[in-house]
Amino acid sequence: MATKFPKFSQALAQDPATRRIWYGLATAHDLESHDGMTEENLYQKIFASHFGHLAVIFLWTSGNLFHVAWQGNFEQWVLNPLKVKPIAHAIWDPHFGQPAVKAFTKGGVSYPVNIATSGVYHWWYTIGMRSNTDLYAGSLFLLFLAGVFLFAGWLHLQPKFRPGLSWFKNNESRLNHHLSGLFGFSSLAWSAHLIHVAIPEARGQHVCWDNFTKVAPHPAGLQPFFTGNWGAYAASPDTTNHIFGTSEGAGTAILTFLGGFHPQTQALWLTDIAHHHLAIGVVFIFAGHMYRTNWGIGHSLKEILDAHRPPGGRLGAGHKGIFETLTNSLHFQLGLALASLGVITSLVAQHMYALPSYAFIAKDYVTQSALYTHHQYIAGFLMVGAFAHGAIFFVRDYDPEQNKNNVLARILDHKEAIISHLSWVSLFLGFHTLGIYVHNDVVVAFGTPEKQILVEPVFAQWIQASSGKALYGFDVLLSSTNSVAANASSNIWLPGWLEAINSGKNSLFLPIGPGDFLIHHAIALALHTTTLILVKGALDARGSKLMPDKKDFGYAFPCDGPGRGGTCDISAWDAFYLSMFWMLNTIGWVTFYWHWKHITIWQGNAGQFNESSTYIMGWLRDYLWLNSSPLINGYNPFGMNSLSVWSWMFLFGHLIWATGFMFLISWRGYWQELIETLVWAHERTPLANLVRWKDKPVALSIVQARLVGLIHFTAGYIFTYAAFVIASTTGKFG
C-alpha cells in the first residue's frame, strides 16, 4: 500500500480526517518536528535547501532576461530610454478581441505586451548591456548556474558529501568565508565589472568578450596603483555635459568621490559606485581574516562575548552564554538574519528613489513607485518573521540555566517595563496624532481651514539644513556658506552633493511641512504599535502572569480548554497574527505618503499634498478617490483601454481581501456544520455520489482558519494597492 501524505509524520499519515492534508501542509517546513529528525540531519536539509533557493532565484532572473531578449524592445529602449516604454514580455491571450489587442500593443512592437515596471532595463543598461545578444548570454549563463546549484544541493545530501554537525557550528570559519568570500570578493568583483565594462560602455567604448583583455579601463593602466599614485584614478572625471553612453563630455577617471547625480541620467556617478564597491570589498576581505580558526591568531567570538560584561555590573553576567545559545539555536540565528535583512530591504526602498543608482530610472515614475512599494512590503514581512522566530526560539531553544543573569535573561526579567513603555508611547502617539487630524478635519468641514493646527517640523528641517538644504534659511553646518564643512565639501569631498540637495530635480531631502509632520507621527504610531505586539508576543512566549506555563503548550495554541477561560488568543502565534494586520496597516500609511507626495511633485503641484494632507478627508478625497479614477474607468461604455487589466485586478483584490473576513469573523462550529451539510448533499446527488473521498471532512482548526483568513486579507490588500499604484501613476505619466 502506498504511504499517504505526509511521509514525514506517521501519526498524521494515519489520521482518518482531512486534517491530515491541512496539518501536513502546515508542518511541511517545520523540519524539527518531522519523524526521526536528528540535529545533524536538520542542518543538512536546511543547507541543501539553500542551493535550491539560489537555483530558483537564478532561474527566475534567467527568465526575465530571456523574455525581454525574445519579446521585449531592449535595443530600441537603449536608443531612447526616456521616451520608449520598456516591454516585459508579450501577452498571448485567446480572450483578447481586437480592442484588447489594440489597447495592449505599445512600445513600438506589433503585438500585445506587458510594460516592465521593475527597472530591469535601467539596471542592465547601466551595467553595460546594450544588445539582445548580451541578454541571451546572461540568460543562458544563469540557467547553467541554476543547474549547477541544483546539482550542488543534491550532492550535499549524498552520504559522502554531507557536512557534519561540527562543520555547521564552526562560527569563526563561517564568518571568515562569508565576510571575505560572499561580501568582500563579490564586491571587489562587482567593482571590477563596473570599471572594466560598465564605465567604458557609459563613455561609448564597447567592451565585449572579443576585446575586454585589450581595452585598458584607464589610460595609465596599473602604473598609478603600483607606484602609490592612486589619485590619478580620480583625476579627470566625466564632465557635467557628459552624454551617457557616448564619449561626448566623458573623462578618464574610474574611482571618484564626486557626490550628487549625473546631470543627464539623474543617477549616481558610476565612478562613485565603483569606488564604493572597491572600498567595501577591501574592508570585508580584511574583516574575513579577523576570526580565529586553524591557527591560534585572531578573535574568538566566545571570548569576545564572554568578556562583554560592563564593569558597573548593571548588566549582570553580560553576554555570557550568548555564544552557546546562538550557536545551538537556528531560530535565534534566523530571527537575527530576518531582522537585519528587513532593515536593509527598507533602506533599499528609501535609497532606490533618494539616491538612484541606475541611469534614467529616476524619470520612470511608475517604476519608482512600484519599486518603493515592493521593497517596503518585503521589509515588513521579513521584520515580522524576525519576531516570530524570536518567539519560537524562546519556546523551543531557550535554556534558563545557560543564560542565567545575562542580557537575555535580564530582558525577560524586566519585560513588563519594556512592554508598558511601548504601550505608553503608542497611546501617546495615537491620541495626539489622531486628535490633530480629527480637529483639522472638523474645522475644514465647517469652512474654517485657517483654524487647523499646523505644526512645522522644525527639528527635521534643521537636520535637512545641516546636511546642506538651503531652502529653510537655517544657515547651519553644510547650509552655511561660511562653515568649515561647506567649504571642505566643495574642494575635498563630494563636490556634487550640495548642488544635488538643492536642485529640486530629484527626491533627495524633499521639502517638508505640517502634512509631513502629521503623517510622520502617524507612521511612528503604527511602527510602535506593531513593535509592541511583536515584542510582547516574543517576551511572553514562555509564560505570562496569566499563564506561567505557556511554553509547555508550544508556539501556537488557541486556548487551554474551558478550565482556564483566560488562556485564549495569547499564544506567541496570536501575537504574530495580530501584528501582521498592523504591519500591513503601517506599510499602507508609508506607501500612501510616499506615493501621494511624489505624484504631486512629479506633476509640479506639490501644493496639493501640502494643503490636503493635514486632515483625514484630504487623504480620502484627494489621494485615494481622486487617483482611483483610472481604475474605475478601466472598463466603460466606450470599450477598454490599457489600464483595464489593473481595474480588474483592483476589483479582484478587493474580492480576495473581503473573502478573508469570512474566515476571520466566524467560529469553527459553523464551518463543521456547513461541511456536514455539503457532504450529506454530495452523497445523495446522482453522478456526484460516484466520487467518494476516504478522509472524513473536518473543519479547519481555529488557528488554521485564522491563517487562511490572514492570507486572503494580505493577498487581497497587496493586489488592490499594487493595481492602484501602477494604474494611477501610469494614468498620469504614461
Swiss-Prot record:
Give the keywords, sorted.
4Fe-4S, Chlorophyll, Chloroplast, Chromophore, Electron transport, Iron, Iron-sulfur, Magnesium, Membrane, Metal-binding, Oxidoreductase, Photosynthesis, Photosystem I, Plastid, Thylakoid, Transmembrane, Transmembrane helix, Transport
Annotated Gene Ontology cellular component terms: chloroplast thylakoid membrane; photosystem I
Membrane topology is: Multi-pass membrane protein
Which top-level enzyme class is recorded in the Swiss-Prot or TrEMBL entry?
Answer: oxidoreductase
Q: Which residues participate in chlorophyll a B3 binding?
A: 662, 670
**InterPro entries linked to this entry:** PSI_PsaA/B (IPR001280), PSI_PsaA/B_CS (IPR020586), PSI_PsaA/B_sf (IPR036408), PSI_PsaB (IPR006244)
Report if keyword Lipid metabolism is assigned.
no
Subunit description: The PsaA/B heterodimer binds the P700 chlorophyll special pair and subsequent electron acceptors. PSI consists of a core antenna complex that captures photons, and an electron transfer chain that converts photonic excitation into a charge separation. The eukaryotic PSI reaction center is composed of at least 11 subunits.
Question: What exactly does this protein do?
Answer: PsaA and PsaB bind P700, the primary electron donor of photosystem I (PSI), as well as the electron acceptors A0, A1 and FX. PSI is a plastocyanin/cytochrome c6-ferredoxin oxidoreductase, converting photonic excitation into a charge separation, which transfers an electron from the donor P700 chlorophyll pair to the spectroscopically characterized acceptors A0, A1, FX, FA and FB in turn. Oxidized P700 is reduced on the lumenal side of the thylakoid membrane by plastocyanin or cytochrome c6.
What is the official name of this protein in its record? Photosystem I P700 chlorophyll a apoprotein A2
Native organism is Rhodomonas salina
Q: What is the lineage of its organism?
A: Eukaryota, Cryptophyceae, Pyrenomonadales, Pyrenomonadaceae, Rhodomonas
Q: Which gene encodes it?
A: psaB
